[in-house]
Amino acid sequence: MKVYFCGSIRGGRDDAELYHRMVAKLQSFATVLTEHVGRRELGDTGEHVTQGDRFIHDRDVDWLRQSDVVVAEVTQPSLGVGYELGRAVDMKKKVLCLFRPSSGRRLSAMIRGADNGDSFVVRDYCQDEIEQVLEDFFSNQK
């Protein structure tokens, strides 16, 4: 199984440590195509690739096409994550969006309203339960 993990990069890296934990857990279930999102040292300027933004876009869309499941941490608002989710829906990918209400933020209605309980799932969670949330989700994906 291949997982495309979405998390904010240029929109802010406040959750970088959490992304690291999530990617580590996801790797116990599947190949994570976007493991770089979980790198603690990745700053909000993004990756330093000489090929530029077009290269990043095309590479990531290719990874999205290859993926079986998309897991997105959506607490930190990010235009890129929203774009990835829209593309994932268009590609008919199974999507799990994870949101922490304790952040004080409100999740966009375009994300929460897309939850259909099947191919697009939005789950509220607390940081200390993230590993269990992922285990529960992936135990139903086999």
Curated annotation (Swiss-Prot):
Keywords assigned by UniProt, alphabetized: Cytoplasm, Glycosidase, Hydrolase, Nucleotide metabolism, Nucleus, Phosphoprotein
Q: Which terms does the UniProt entry file under GO BP? A: deoxyribonucleoside monophosphate catabolic process; nucleoside salvage; nucleotide metabolic process; positive regulation of cell growth
Which Gene Ontology cellular component terms are annotated?
cytoplasm; nucleus
**What top-level class of enzyme does the UniProt entry assign?**
hydrolase
Binding positions for 5-hydroxymethyl-dUMP?
7, 9-11, 78, 80, 84, 108
Report the InterPro entries cross-referenced here: 2'-dNMP_N-hydrolase (IPR051239), DNPH1 (IPR028607), Nucleoside_deoxyribTrfase (IPR007710)
Task: Give any GO molecular function from the UniProt entry.
Answer: 5-hydroxymethyl-dUMP N-hydrolase activity
| Database matches in HAMAP family | Nuc_phosphate_hydrolase
Q: What is this protein called?
A: 5-hydroxymethyl-dUMP N-hydrolase
Q: Which organism is it from?
A: Tetraodon nigroviridis (Spotted green pufferfish)
Q: What's the encoding gene here?
A: dnph1
